[in-house]
C-alpha cells in the first residue's frame, strides 16, 4: 500500500525563460514535437509515453514557464535540456 503512494516521476522545478514572441515560440515547439499528443487547455502540454512537459505563458511578463516530468531522472534531465534549448534558441 505504501509503495503505491510514492510518486514514480522525476520532475523539473518550474523554469522561467524570457521569450519575445511567445505564440510563435509555442508554434515552433509544437512543430518540433509533431509526433506527440497535445493538449492546449493550460498553455501547451506535449505528451509522450515516458515523459511530458507543459509550457505556460506568464500573464504579467514575457516569460514561458516550463514544467517537465519523466520516468527516469536521466530522461528528465535530457529532455529538460532539449526543451530549454528550443525555448531559448
Describe the residue ranges of each PLM region.
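Phosphate-binding and adjacent anionic-ligand microenvironments
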Residues: 1-67, 72-89
